Amino acid sequence: MKKAHVYAIPAIGAALIAVLAQISIPIGPVPFTLQNFAIGLIATVFRPREAVLSVGLYLLLGAIGLPVFAGGGAGFHALIGPTAGYLWFYLVYSGLTSSLTNSDSGFVRIFLANLLGDTLVFVGGIIGLHFLAGMPFEKALVVGVLPFIIPDTGKIIAISFISRPLLQRLKNQAYFAN
């Protein structure tokens, strides 16, 4: 891979996450956003290294104060606050999902890989809400997972539909060629 791709691909991924994170609807301690849609799409289309670097760069940009987190949030406190579990587990989501998918993956494989990654983000979210916000596990599940099951399933279905034609269009580009 060309050296420029090593830097450009994660930067594009981080920018996509930052833009879609701004589409945010506050519905309690955890807002509804499209950042996990961006991460799922990146994880499905990018290789594991670039997918994880995209999320890592996104987290770094937010930590140093750029308003890239949901609703324009920024600062290191977001990485140790109530929603930190979700943010940190986005690294797991991107790496795992990217490792399980490739340009030959079908709808079901893409769906299941993203479902697994998203589920792990929920686990991280519950852990963060419990330990960092002092919320009982049951309440963390009720406010941090249940309201998002249907919307996230819809996002994963959209990722599964969008990524196949996207991968087909990109497969002749240097980075995406097998």
PLM features: residue spans?
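Helix-boundary and loop/linker segments of multi-pass membrane transporters
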Residues: 1-3, 29-30, 70-71, 102-103, ...
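Membrane-helix interface segments
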Residues: 2-6, 48-53, 103-109, 136-137
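Hydrophobic alpha-helical transmembrane segments
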Residues: 7-12, 37-41, 51-57, 79, ...
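Short helix-perturbing small/polar motifs within transmembrane alpha-helices
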Residues: 12, 19, 76-123
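Alpha-helical membrane-inserting segments
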Residues: 16, 20, 24, 42, ...
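Membrane-embedded alpha-helical hairpins and interfacial helices in multi-pass inner-membrane proteins
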Residues: 72, 106-178
